[in-house]
């Protein structure tokens, strides 16, 4: 019997620091102590990278609180771009593990009937000229297996002597400006405080209530995703799947493919060990009476429902149908792709609570940048706090948090807008037009301004200007978003109005987004 490990809860004691150690040469040098005490809420990748980078920059990580009862190895593959991977160069053991776990894959784009549109190809950042520019930095694989990547971070956190406290659900965030602290109250009534609290506890974080007075309202994107993963040996039992990909698996290769049909698309990853897919239909294609999409990673959907949705358009390749048919019962998640308008403020009024990752800005799969942005956030925040608290003066933390916010907001907003462009391409109703003109246009966009960014270097370049802007009111201009772009705030409602008016998001972009 093959087990489904799409959602696995790990042992909370496995990463006890007493079980892990590093020799001095395997840890990065620490910056001079800032005497800043940092409390982190959330032990996902954003929280763990925040802990690692705060330690490296000389801050004291006093606690890492996590609401789950142990590590949660949710998901299958994630894309972590060069702008995030480059920041891990300071951690020798992480670099070694990234190289050991390295797996390459080629990318294909196909019509839903199996007709090839483009491929083999790759994400733009791994073209030969860009690989040469990153010589000496950690290799950026086309994907990371999330379970392996996350366990790597947990090991490194344990090696520097930090322990995640599981089963700690935060019910309230607070700050005391006079006392110079922020804090949280957990479900059991315990109070924890520090000079700075980092909310890395994803969407619906209770820090929203302190910072904005409410949770950000959600609006449907008009799409949802049926997402599942299963062992490759199970998928290979289907003759059509075996015929199409059996030799690929036998050669030990991995494929990353996008299958595109009118009103829906399917992202597919095939490796020798497991297969993962996500079917994203427009809402009008959803099956009446099916499982309502909710923001939960508990798998509760049977494959027949996914097949019913798939068959809303005819002529799917039998290999795709066979893959879904061989997915174990109740092993599929139906997740709504909800949009939340980006808030400008990610810090509390007194600056003692600050948000990173999905707590500050949610993303959707079409951006292919959620994990990348979370790591960029963590690195940026730790470096800003280093400069703000230089000389062992933790009182500078609120200003450091605000500078972090200033450096990140516009870039994140632009990345979010890119997800609409990718969604348009992947859900195009008339793929014949794409095929006739330029097949390259079907590719998921991963532009230079996104992947060539170095968040740590950017802090050291811009900190003085940002400080002068916030303290003295001087002009400030970010340069970490598309060149030539005249940044303006935008809302989901405005984007939807343009789409309903027949306008393409890509045609409305100014500056060089490519």
Curated annotation (Swiss-Prot):
* Cofactor(s) needed: FAD
How might one describe the protein's use in biotech or industry? Secalonic acids show unprecedented anticancer activities against various human cancer cells and might be interesting for further derivatization, targeting diseases such as cancer.
Say which enzyme class the record assigns: oxidoreductase
Give the pathway: Secondary metabolite biosynthesis
* Enzyme Commission code(s) on record: 1.-.-.-
**Which superkingdom, per the lineage?**
Eukaryota
Q: So where does this one cross the membrane?
A: none
One Pfam family per UniProt: FAD_binding_3
Named from the GO MF annotations, one term is: monooxygenase activity
According to its UniProt record, which residues of this chain constitute the active site? 227
Which keywords has UniProt assigned to this entry? FAD, Flavoprotein, Monooxygenase, Oxidoreductase
| Residues given in the record as FAD binding sites | 79, 146, 358, 371
Gene3D superfamilies from the entry?
FAD/NAD(P)-binding domain
Specify residue ranges for compositional bias: Basic and acidic residues.
8-17
Query: Region Disordered: which residues?
Result: 1-29
The family line of this record is: Belongs to the paxM FAD-dependent monooxygenase family.
What biological function has been recorded for the protein in this entry? FAD-dependent monooxygenase; part of the gene cluster that mediates the biosynthesis of the tetrahydroxanthone dimer secalonic acid D. The pathway begins with the synthesis of atrochrysone thioester by the polyketide synthase AacuL. The atrochrysone carboxyl ACP thioesterase AacuM then breaks the thioester bond and releases the atrochrysone carboxylic acid from AacuL. Atrochrysone carboxylic acid is decarboxylated by the decarboxylase AacuI, and oxidized by the anthrone oxygenase AacuG to yield emodin. Emodin is then reduced to emodin hydroquinone by a yet unidentified oxidoreductase.
Q: What is this protein called?
A: FAD-dependent monooxygenase AacuC
Please tell me the species this chain comes from.
Aspergillus aculeatus (strain ATCC 16872 / CBS 172.66 / WB 5094)
Q: Which gene encodes it?
A: AacuC
